[in-house]
Amino acid sequence: MGVGDPLPLPPEKNRREVNKPPDIASTSSSSASAVNNARLSDAPILLFVYFHKAFRAQLAELQFLAGDTVRSGSDLAVELRSKFEFLKLVYKYHSAAEDEVIFSALDTRVKNIVFNYSLEHDATDDLFTSVFHWLNVLEEEQGNRADVLREVVLCIGTIQSSICQHMLKEERQVFPLMIENFSFEEQASLVWQFICSVPVMVLEEIFPWMTSLLSPKEKSEVETCFKEVVPNELSLQLVINSWLIDDSQSSLTALTKIMKGVQSVEVSENMTNSQTNSSSSGVFQRFWQWSKKMSFSSPNTGHILVHGIHLWHNAIRKDLVDIQKGLCQLTFPSLSLDLNVLVVRLNFLADVLIFYSNAFKTFFYPVFEDMVDQQHSSSSKQFTIDGHVENFKKSLDLETRAGSDNFVITLQEKLESLILTVAKQFSIEETEVFPIISKNCNIEMQRQLLYRSIHFLPLGLLKCVIMWFSAQLPEDECQSIIHYLSSEDSFPNKPFAHLLLQWFRFGYSGKTPVESFWNELSFMFKPRCSFEEELTEEASGSFFQQSPQKLFKVSDPYSMDPPAGYMNETPYSSAMNQQILIPGKLRPLLHLPDLFGDKTIGEHLTMDLKPIDLIFYFHKAMKKDLDYLVRGSARLATDYSFLGEFQQRFHLIKFLYQIHSDAEDEIAFPALEAKGKLQNISQSYSIDHELEVEHLNKVSFLLNELAELNMLVLDHKNVKYEKLCMSLQDICKSIHKLLSEHLHREETELWCLFRDCFTIEEQEKIIACMLGRISGEILQDMIPWLMESLIPDEQHAVMSLWRQATRKTMFGEWLTEWYNSHAVEEETEEANKDPSENSDPLDVVWSYLFEGAADEYKGSICSKPLEETELKGIMNKPLGKAAPNNKVEFGNKEENHLEISGSKKVCTGADETKYKEQTDSNAQAFQMSHNTSQSGQDSRYECLLSMSQEDVEATIRRISRDSSLDPQKKSYIIQNLLMSRWIATQRIYNLEPSILSSNREAVPGQNPSYRDPHKLIFGCKHYKRSCKLLAPCCNKLYTCIRCHDEEVDHLLDRKQITKMMCMKCMIIQPVGASCSNISCSSSMGKYYCKICKLFDDDREIYHCPYCNLCRLGKGLSIDYFHCMKCNACMSRLIVEHVCREKCLEDNCPICHEYIFTSNSPVKALPCGHVMHSTCFQEYTCSHYTCPICSKSLGDMQVYFRMLDALLAEQKMPDEYLNQTQVILCNDCGRKGNAPYHWLYHKCSSCASYNTRLF
């Protein structure tokens, strides 16, 4: 199969189309439009968005290239790997710049935004790892080429979806905030800091790469932006412009291997005379060929490399020793400022050593290996300082942020170890490596090595190094270097050489004192603190007894006002390069507690269960279904018959995920952000939800396309089918990656916040609000789906949390009723299920015992046929509840209170006469049809039911001795034999309506009733329906339960109702959504509830699983929600209300009707009590206080002012004029004094007259 490109699909017409992110961009908020409408000339920070455009274009190009089926696998793999290595490197620097420069700055102005985006950056490495694996397989030509290419295309699609969605989110949230909160100058400063923090070698490649993928207009805008961003220094402007217009790829090979930590050359064994071997591919030969092309005119001054390296090593050693001495002199708290400077110097030298070590491994050491055999290079190869320096840098960072009481002592010990390590490494290099390189390389080649090494440093750090190094050198050495840099042929890039000369001269001039130099560098190398607030307590006690956190007077390292100085014209982010070069993160943007240690999430939750954990159990189930999507989409490529099952499962996943996302966006996240310090923390996740729904919609579209294709084309190998399957698998893998990472980030960032910031009661309220929006029909799908993904302990934990959150409702009752009926159905299905073949269990038993048995054995079993009266008695004796139909299709699922009142039957005598004949004929037809179809069955049922216990035992022994049966067949027949009598009884019991219907007078009320006799509409005044219910207490048919309750002196228990009568065919039958008479099959009503035994063909009704009643309305989450505390279904318009526990489970204070099951509208009072709306209207004609708690029913200020005016006109008798009375206010609950009055007493606290004498 040719791989090719996935089939185009809407709404995103082509995934490879340049600069077109998913269609979700059309739903961008006003913040996103701020980015789209802003110009780069007005907002320099948008340079990062132009990088986004380049990334999108490059990914589209790579996906197109991967679809090339003509080229050989190895050639294609090499080209793709080279481009992906470069893309990975550029994206790493882009992400590091956002983390350490953009995000850190934004976090000083807008809190709780950036951590989620940094987590997304961390997840990118896995994406590239996968594609590199398949490229290796493709290059080695292992396996089927088409299958490997398919995997490569799928990996690229996943990378494209993940990175493009991440960039789109940044454009919708991060960069609009940057434009809003930062001035033009501040944005330009951040962009320039990013440029100065990237190695020169990388900058030389990034800028041409980016501009080559932009349109001419965009390229011009970028060039104009750089003129504004780069400081107004001619040398810098010339250098940046030279990089922008340079489109050479000379250093691409070395560049892409900088970060890989591998040697970029192939070792050649015989390199003694390698200068003349132009066919060799070693680094030495490439540098040699390069040096021959150069025409350096400077004189050959000898071993320039060895001499320069000695100067470099001595400067580093000298500074390390000076710092060590400075640490030893710290004995008093007054010298704590000196400690700040020493830590900055250590950070600077650590960065210098890290870059130097990487440059040595990348350039110098491979050349050295090309010149000697492995035996001579073993000592230098086994010992390198990079690991020691990285560990020291990590330790320094951690100790500075957290530290211990012995911070300085610990630092001294680690520094001493570092000095010994560095000295040993430098000694090996000076005695083994550099002398050989200097001896075998001419001056031009040595300069090329130095040139490449200098380019390894970031621009900002390079300036710091030159300034620092020039201050360490004697005057004659400085003059020699100045002379070298001043020569015309010192470097290929003349502007860059001139810039280095300018920096060196400034450092050599001494215009910046050493103290000022380190103070200026403190802005770049100041250690980052993990705490947000500056500690202002004064140090007390001895120096070594202080907390290390109090030793550093740390200013904001991301202030937009860096200290003025020559050094800060080229700012440098040390943390940005640490993120690239040092494995592991040094900076936690947010400190998360170690919730689990080495335990899994499930193990932890069962130990420390909290209500909010219910959300994350849902996450676990969702993750398993994401795996199912990937497996299922792959299976569809070879099995189109699987489409129906996959489509059904996907729609369930999509539906449940949408419910979960909406609940988080509308309930959980707002509750979290309501905590003052957590504002904005969830906005990124809400954007994720919106974008992920778009991806799910694409899957729905593809599945519909596949379904239509299957109906028209039976050949599943059709090319269009293959392309659709390819597109489906591509999107499913992308969804798996996006949603898995999304759920992981929620658990990483938000879970501990929910658990720690909310009390148990608050968590229960959040969960209760989320559950109160889920209808019973959804719960019947959700609960089994959730349970099948969890282990037994987790299942128990989930149901425990669920029951706890709904303990004040009828949920337990609903769950029991639903689960019992569900279990009965499953048992019945299991009893009728043949594990080996699709045959009836009674047929299996019958064929073995009777058809294959001898005549005398048949007679022995069937010698006791049941008499008709005995059979009727058995059939009329229920052995258990008939299994309800659990797969009834519900109508509308949502509404408010309902248990509707009833009416008497409306049926004329003529109607009875007319329908008596119809009833008899229908009953006769029904009975005849059953007699015909069941005559053979009845004889079998009689024989099976006539078997005694002794007969059953004898039969079991006979089966066990039958040598013609295998053990599995024996077990199966014995099992069916033991169940046969129960199954036969159940089936006979379900035939009971035909017997009952044969004698119509035996059941009173077996005639139709009408809601509208003139239009012949079935029902009663309460309901429009096509059936009657058989009341077991009266053995009489009533149209509805309320009709029964109004006619007799007792109440009908709905749970006891098992039979109904169809008013069209007049057949009594088990309760169901439609008539079981095949000749009728009429619907009993648009809405049917098997729990309430409620039918209605007129209104929108839903069954609330928490009230366990049917209510009028469209349903939970549509126009109603269930408040778990009030235990009431309420309109979504009154989400904010006064909760009163089980407020509806009481009588109306006016008419004393039980409100919970009343069908009359209910009025909620401000105090939380309720009464009927009609009762409220009548009551408020003469009262203004609650009849239960006496609080005012509304705002009574107008009435109270009228009383003020009335009392002001009244004159009290003299004997009462100065008397007061003690009162208690019903509104505010306070006690106070009021002037004497026979009726009205005003509260002195709230000015209410709703008071009483105390």
Curated annotation (Swiss-Prot):
Residues 1-30 are annotated as: Disordered. Zn(2+) 3 binds at C1062, C1065, C1075, C1080. Keywords: Iron, Ligase, Membrane, Metal-binding, Nucleus, Transmembrane, Transmembrane helix, Ubl conjugation pathway, Zinc, Zinc-finger. It comes from the Eukaryota. The chain crosses the membrane at residues 454-474. It is a single-pass membrane protein. Zn(2+) 4 binds at C1089, C1092, H1103, C1110. The keyword Amino-acid biosynthesis does not apply. It is found in: Membrane; Nucleus. One of its GO terms (molecular function) is zinc ion binding. Zn(2+) 1 binds at C1020, H1022, C1040, C1043. Signal peptide: none annotated. Zn(2+) 5 binds at C1104, C1107, H1122, C1129. A zinc finger (CHY-type) spans 1013-1082. The record marks E98 as: Required for iron-dependent instability. InterPro entries: Hemerythrin-like, RCHY1_zinc-ribbon, Znf_CHY, Znf_CHY_sf, Znf_CTCHY, Znf_CTCHY_sf, Znf_RING, Znf_RING/FYVE/PHD. Induction: Induced by iron deficiency. The keyword Zinc applies. One of its GO terms (cellular component) is nucleus. PROSITE patterns: ZF_CHY, ZF_CTCHY, ZF_RING_2. Probable E3 ubiquitin-protein ligase that may regulate the response to iron deficiency and thus contributes to iron homeostasis. This is Zinc finger protein BRUTUS-like At1g18910.
